[in-house]
């Protein structure tokens, strides 16, 4: 008994000792650590212990040393024995004035958990075209990382779609939505180092920093030169770059080409396929962009092979039609003869074809009796003659009216014998397959199959294609294959520069050369520069660049990149290199750099007025006012329309040409920008947990940020305790969340303030060549004509005050869109600035926005369901207004072209009557000036301004050697004259003379000297001296289908000219009426001729002799004319 009591006492003492030890240990632990910090990237907690024994840097600072090409980040590790720093304080500890108190280490010496992802637990959070965003966990701490390499991430969660490697071509972000569809080559994660409260620690490659992550659309960047070439088969151009690696691709605006970028080093050759020559594709190479000219490969090949021979070119170009004609001849003669002769021997083939096509044959035969043009006797097809063939539809031997009742297909009797059988019976099958209609159809199918077999064996083109060497491409103009490599950047300094007050001393390493010169640095640069490289930067580039150099390091210097094609300054070049490094410092500067475009890819094909497709109309003056002929012109306000007017008062020898061309018509909208919205790609969460206290206690260590904050209390109770925390109904978890936005899919929301109809109208002819913008608000007026718009906006889909969205595809969308600062559940949330900073969101998260979890033994966790408002998914309810992409001007207005009529364009033209009279004497032309600028042998030509004074009013023809002109006739008035003329010259017209022929009279001609010509040869793909391009353009103009159509309608110009704006419509109506009239008369003539032949009326009748004149031997009357001596002829068959 005593032993049992002794054992009981020992157990109680042991339990008491264990309990006391636990309490003491917990007290000691609580003194050492007050709480835990958990940071979540997405759904994963990241834990920092704020204990004195286990320190983790709560702040970082970067100290930069002076080096030549790149700068190294240094992090300071600061010890904080107290609690965690408040969020509103600086996220980095300021550098102390005493360098001896700092502990400075290299970033490369710090343990980088992002680089050890293969041996740690990691998860892929996002994959872009050029890098990856992921998180790794080490000792309960989760680190957020962005890397340009996929090495070591194969074992991470969500790595199924992770590529083996990312492209290394340099890219920079695009912020302007209208540039995305032209230059977008994918997306990339960038770090924005802005001085805002929403920053958090992030590591890019191996460089730690504080900022926010966003997914941006990117474009290519770099120095690239496109080598000109004669654009002929095999349609190859060459590109070169001095950089170590460069990217290029061929892109059609709006096309998704994020994985089609091709990298090269040094030089590369590009061969264009036929689909790339449609005039819509662009060649993008680094900063350069070039429009691939529209080229009809088939036409160009024929023109090159049969140059200077228009007949051979026509035969080669139209060879596809010749092939069809040949096949048609083969089908209708030998193949048809062969099919007809083998019908019976090949009965098995026709039975098989009939079995395959039986449903079609059955349907055609059953519907035949309802066909309006069938023969009334036997059912054959009858369109013109209304006569039947000898064999009817049921293969009767002769045609007769009784066949209709005998043939089951044409019979309408319900009790026919065949109605007893099913449609699928053998009786019906034999009947259907053996009808005349079915046999004719099966024969036709057989002929087509034989023709297709023969067609496939014929050559596709008469023009031979040139083959390239195996594995190489020929570069036109170069006799060799160029594979030169450029020198790489040096790994260490090669020179030394010492800037003094009065001189500069330069020393070249490895030599004994020392150069001394005067101090010619930039003036008024007041900043401290101690190291040698700082002095050099201050001297040559200024203090602004030195500030970037010190505070914004370049991890990759890109020393070969000059940015010359964009015209970047030294500061702009440095910022562009920072963007290449994946760092965004300022969205305003970024937008400026990404908005720069080098090349002609955005240039529209500004061709001259297409006179070959415009209708021609003779125009009569309406009245005479003050000695001037007044012409009243009215046209439909539709883009691409126009008219060529021929003016003549019946006194002048030649008509005067006056052309009106409406180049484009649309609506100019003035808008007010509201906000930007984008989808949420991931969420960053930062929270802090306490064992005791409430939200106020928690906020002492985790301060409020102002938006998207949350707090959960109580968090400590039975069953929800961390180790050594025995509080009941105590504790709190507080923090905030920040979203990572996919700016690649962002929409910008605008409010429409005003709409105005705008038309670009080009005038050519006797008034010279000029294009003017006319609006509905302000009529256009000059000395010779007036123009105004009669607006009609009832078809416009955008109303004033409506909210519209400008999408990443540059299209305009409308629908239910949330207004600014409106939490309604419509498309438009989150509401952001251009750089992805929220401007309207939830101040405090609610219970439905997150979930909180804990365990009896373990850490607490917070999962964010929705960080703020998110209605981006409602974008599917938006409606695209137009298929035409638009570009905004300073985010305040845009122009949207319309494909329908917006009203009427009314013009009043007053021309002096002297223009239509022969000049009485040679005019006196003084103060002449003719200046031109542009390119030779190109689509744009030379834009010239002709100015002079005249003492007479007259009409004149103009010409100049080796040049074609946009207009060959001018209306000259008395006094000052000014004309815009476009010249297309094969040689430089500088110092040549333009000749004016008043009223076409060479005896009183006047010469004007070309004063100045500025030739600006653009760097693009096609060479400006491409003679084949000129021949192709000439051929297309001469053989245009529109030109042929206008030629057919031209006989009706005079009548149609009296109907004003209905000119072209009347011409078409008259042409159709003329065709019907001719067809009707031809039908009557055919019927008369057929009756004449059928009745043998052409045979001679016996002659009739007159008793009174027996001496007359020649027959005067024919037998068929003696209608009184024979019964009347039956002409019922002609009806």
Curated annotation (Swiss-Prot):
What is any one of the record's Gene Ontology cellular component terms? Answer: host cell endoplasmic reticulum membrane
- Site Cleavage: list residues: 484-485
The opening ranks of the lineage are: Viruses, Riboviria, Orthornavirae, Negarnaviricota, Polyploviricotina
Disulfide pairs? 114-145, 122-156, 224-285
**Motif range (Cell attachment site):** 41-43
Organism equals: Tomato spotted wilt virus (strain Brazilian Br-01) (TSWV)
For this entry, the protein name equals Envelopment polyprotein
According to its UniProt entry, the protein's GO biological process terms are: fusion of virus membrane with host endosome membrane; symbiont entry into host cell; symbiont-mediated perturbation of host process; virion attachment to host cell
Query: Which residue ranges are recorded for the region named Non-covalent dimerization?
Result: 177-195
Asked if the Swiss-Prot or TrEMBL record annotates the protein with the keyword Ion transport, the reply is no
Give me the glycosylation sites of this protein.
Answer: 116, 210, 605, 980
Annotated keywords: Disulfide bond, Fusion of virus membrane with host endosomal membrane, Fusion of virus membrane with host membrane, Glycoprotein, Host endoplasmic reticulum, Host Golgi apparatus, Host membrane, Host-virus interaction, Membrane, Signal, Transmembrane, Transmembrane helix, Viral attachment to host cell, Viral penetration into host cytoplasm, Virion, Virus entry into host cell
Membrane-spanning ranges: 315-366, 1068-1088
Domain comment (free text): The cell attachment site present in these glycoproteins may help in the adhesion of virus to cells.
């Amino acid at each position: 008994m005593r032993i049992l009591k002794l054992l009981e006492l020992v157990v109680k003492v042991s339990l008491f000792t264990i309990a006391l030890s636990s309490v003491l240990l917990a007290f000691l632990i609580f003194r050492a650590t007050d709480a835990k910090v958990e940071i979540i990237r997405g759904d994963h907690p990241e834990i920092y212990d704020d204990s004195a024994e286990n320190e983790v840097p709560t702040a970082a600072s970067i100290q930069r040393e002076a080096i030549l090409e790149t700068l190294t980040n240094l992090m300071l590790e600061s010890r904080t024995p107290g609690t965690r720093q408040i969020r509103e304080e600086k996220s980095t500890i300021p550098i102390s004035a005493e360098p001896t108190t700092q502990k400075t280490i290299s970033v490369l010496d710090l343990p980088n958990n992002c680089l050890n992802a293969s041996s740690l637990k990691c998860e892929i959070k996002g994959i872009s075209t050029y890098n990856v965003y992921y998180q790794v966990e080490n000792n309960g701490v989760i680190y957020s990382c962005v890397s340009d390499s996929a090495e070591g991430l194969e074992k991470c969660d969500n790595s199924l779609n992770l590529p083996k490697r990312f492209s290394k071509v340099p890219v920079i972000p695009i912020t302007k939505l209208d540039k995305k569809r032209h230059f977008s080559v994918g997306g990339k994660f960038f770090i924005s180092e802005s001085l805002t409260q929403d920053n958090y620690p992030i590591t890019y490659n191996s460089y730690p920093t504080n900022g926010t992550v966003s997914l941006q659309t990117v474009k290519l960047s770099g120095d690239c030169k496109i080598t000109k070439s004669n654009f002929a088969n095999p349609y190859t151009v060459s590109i070169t770059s001095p950089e170590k690696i460069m990217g290029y691709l061929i892109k059609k605006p709006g096309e998704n080409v994020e994985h089609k970028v091709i990298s090269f080093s040094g030089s590369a050759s590009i061969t264009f396929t036929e689909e790339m020559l449609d005039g819509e594709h662009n060649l993008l190479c680094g900063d350069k962009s070039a429009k691939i000219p529209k080229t009809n490969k088939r036409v160009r090949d024929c023109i090159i092979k049969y140059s200077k021979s228009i007949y051979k070119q026509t035969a080669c170009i139209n060879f596809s039609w010749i092939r069809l004609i040949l096949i048609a001849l083969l089908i209708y003669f030998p193949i048809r003869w062969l099919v007809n002769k083998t019908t019976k021997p090949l009965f098995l083939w026709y039975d098989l074809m009939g079995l395959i096509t039986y449903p079609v044959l059955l349907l055609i035969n059953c519907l035949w009796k309802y066909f309006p043009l069938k023969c009334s006797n036997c059912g054959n097809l009858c369109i013109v003659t209304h006569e039947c063939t000898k064999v009817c539809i049921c293969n009767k031997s002769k045609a007769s009216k009784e066949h209709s009742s005998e043939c089951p297909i044409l019979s309408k009797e319900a009790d026919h014998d065949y109605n007893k059988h099913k449609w699928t019976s053998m009786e019906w099958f034999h009947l259907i397959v053996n009808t005349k209609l079915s046999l004719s159809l099966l024969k036709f199918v057989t002929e087509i199959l034989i023709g297709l077999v023969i067609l496939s064996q014929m050559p596709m083109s008469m023009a031979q294609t040139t083959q390239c060497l195996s594995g190489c491409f020929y570069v036109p103009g170069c006799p060799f294959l160029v594979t030169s490599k450029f020198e790489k950047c040096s790994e260490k300094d090669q020179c030394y520069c010492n800037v003094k007050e009065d001189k500069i001393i330069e020393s070249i390493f490895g030599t004994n050369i020392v150069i001394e010169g005067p101090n010619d640095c930039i003036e008024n640069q007041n900043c401290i520069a101690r190291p040698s490289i700082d002095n050099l930067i201050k001297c040559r580039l200024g203090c602004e660049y030195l500030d970037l150099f010190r505070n914004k390091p370049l991890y990759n210097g890109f020393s070969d990149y000059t940015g010359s094609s964009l015209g970047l300054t030294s500061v702009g070049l440095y910022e562009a290199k920072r963007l290449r490094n994946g760092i965004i410092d300022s969205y305003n500067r970024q937008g400026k750099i990404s908005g720069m475009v080098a090349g002609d890819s955005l240039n529209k094909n500004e061709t001259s007025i297409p006179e070959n497709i415009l209708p021609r109309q003779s125009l009569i003056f309406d009245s005479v006012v003050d000695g001037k002929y007044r012409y009243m012109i009215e046209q439909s306000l539709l883009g691409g329309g126009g008219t060529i007017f021929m003016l003549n008062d019946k006194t002048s020898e030649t008509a005067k040409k006056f052309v009106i061309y409406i180049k484009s018509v649309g609506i100019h909208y003035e808008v007010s920008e509201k906000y930007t919205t984008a989808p949420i790609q991931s969420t960053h969460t930062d929270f802090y947990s306490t064992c005791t206290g409430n939200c106020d206690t928690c906020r002492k260590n985790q301060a409020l940020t102002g938006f998207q904050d949350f707090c959960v209390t109580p968090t400590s109770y039975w069953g929800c305790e961390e180790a050594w925390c025995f509080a009941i109904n105590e504790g709190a978890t507080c923090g905030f969340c920040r979203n990572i936005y996919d700016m690649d899919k962002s929409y910008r929301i605008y409010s429409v303030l005003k709409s105005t109809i705008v038309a670009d109208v080009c005038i050519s002819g006797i008034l010279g060549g000029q294009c003017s913008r006319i609006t509905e608000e302000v009529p256009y007026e000059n000395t010779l004509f007036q123009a105004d718009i009669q607006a009609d906006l009832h078809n416009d889909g955008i109303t004033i005050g409506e909210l519209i969205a400008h999408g990443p595809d540059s299209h305009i969308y409308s629908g239910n869109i949330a207004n600014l600062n409106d939490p309604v559940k419509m498309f438009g949330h989150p509401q952001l600035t251009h750089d992805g900073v929220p401007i309207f969101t939830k101040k405090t998260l609610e219970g439905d926005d997150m979930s909180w979890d804990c365990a009896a033994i373990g850490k607490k966790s917070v999962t964010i369901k929705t960080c703020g408002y998110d209605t981006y998914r409602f974008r599917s309810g938006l409606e695209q207004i137009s298929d035409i992409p638009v570009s905004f001007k300073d985010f305040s207005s845009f122009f949207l072209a319309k494909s329908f009529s917006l009203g009427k364009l009314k013009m009043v033209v007053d021309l002096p009557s002297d223009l239509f009279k022969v000049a009485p004497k040679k005019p006196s032309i003084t103060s002449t000036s003719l200046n031109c600028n542009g390119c030779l042998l190109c689509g744009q030509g030379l834009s010239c301004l002709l100015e002079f004074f005249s003492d007479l009013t007259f009409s004149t023809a103009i010409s100049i050697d080796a040049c074609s002109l946009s207009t060959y006739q001018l209306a000259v008035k008395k006094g000052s004259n000014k004309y815009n003329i476009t010249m297309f010259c094969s040689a430089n017209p500088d110092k040549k003379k333009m000749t004016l022929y008043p009223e076409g009279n060479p005896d009183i001609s006047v010469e004007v000297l070309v004063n100045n010509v500025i030739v600006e040869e653009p760097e693009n793909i096609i060479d400006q001296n491409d003679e084949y391009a000129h021949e192709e353009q000439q051929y297309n103009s001469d053989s245009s289908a529109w030109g042929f159509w206008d030629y057919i309608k031209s006989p009706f110009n005079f009548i149609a000219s009296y109907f004003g704006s209905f000119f072209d419509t009347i011409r078409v109506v008259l042409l159709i009426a003329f065709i019907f009239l001719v067809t009707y008369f031809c039908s009557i003539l055919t019927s008369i001729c057929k009756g004449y032949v059928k009745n043998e009326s052409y045979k001679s009748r016996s002659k009739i002799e007159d008793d009174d004149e027996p001496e007359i031997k020649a027959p005067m009357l024919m037998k068929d004319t003696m209608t009184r001596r024979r019964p009347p002829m039956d002409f019922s068959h002609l009806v």
